[in-house]
């Protein structure tokens, strides 16, 4: 099973009122799409970007076992527009901000629970 995940997050005035959006496309015979949008309160753009990735992984971590889809062997392909988040998650940039470090750890835990 393959999932294509698009995430985005943003804050007005940075920091300011922030929200995240996620679209998860399940590539199979049904090609089901799931959309998640959520206000996350006051945050920076970078916090919102990380939160969107976390929300997508949390959804998949809960969805996969309930659907009988094995966690291991499932392909999850992410698309996001935050170079900072991509580079930090891939270990290319250091995570200096404490809040971003906390969010990155949450993302890494979810990845390991899914089998990534």
Describe each region flagged by the PLM:
Residues 10-14, 54-116:
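RNase H catalytic domain
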Residues 1-47, 51, 58-62:
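RNase H-like nuclease fold core
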């Amino acid at each position: 099973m393959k999932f294509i995940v698009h995430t985005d997050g943003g804050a007005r005035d940075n920091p300011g009122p922030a929200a995240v959006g996620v679209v998860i496309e399940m590539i199979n015979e049904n090609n089901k799409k799931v959309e998640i949008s959520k206000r996350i309160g006051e945050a920076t753009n970078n916090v919102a970007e990380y939160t969107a990735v976390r929300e997508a992984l949390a959804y998949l971590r809960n969805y996969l076992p309930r659907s009988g889809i094995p966690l291991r062997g499932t392909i999850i392909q992410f698309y996001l527009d935050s170079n900072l988040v991509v580079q930090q998650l891939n270990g290319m940039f250091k995570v200096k901000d404490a809040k971003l470090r906390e969010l990155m750890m949450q993302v890494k835990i979810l990845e390991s629970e899914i089998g990534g």
